[in-house]
């Protein structure tokens, strides 16, 4: 969920658009990256993803770049990756405000 922070801390994302889990998104900016709330971000040779489920999106994105769109579509089909979540609360913008605030209050993504 937060692997992009390692890239940012190493200085590899300075001045680049990037994403990570929404609870740690502001940390990217502290290391010079340009945080965005998108699920998958490609900037140059770097591809970053938000929370754990967006890792599948990132994998398909990379596969498309490496092996072609048809191959990525075939893998998506064979794995039956067709997200239909039972709740529409997969981002802070969609989730109930009390849940967002609860998790922000308990967040451990604190760097000094």
Locate the predicted segments by residue.
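Active-site-adjacent pocket-lining segments in enzyme domains
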Residues: 2-112
């Amino acid at each position: 969920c937060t692997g992009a922070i390692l890239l940012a801390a190493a200085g590899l994302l300075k001045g680049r658009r990037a994403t990570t889990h929404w609870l740690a998104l502001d940390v990217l900016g502290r290391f010079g990256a340009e945080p965005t709330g998108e699920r998958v971000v490609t900037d140059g040779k770097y591809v970053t993803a938000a929370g754990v489920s967006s890792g599948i999106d990132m994998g398909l994105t990379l596969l498309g770049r490496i092996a072609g769109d048809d191959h990525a579509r075939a893998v998506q089909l064979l794995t039956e990756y067709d997200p239909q979540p039972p709740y529409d609360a997969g981002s802070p913008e969609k989730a109930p405000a009390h849940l967002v605030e609860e998790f922000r209050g308990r967040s451990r993504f604190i760097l000094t």
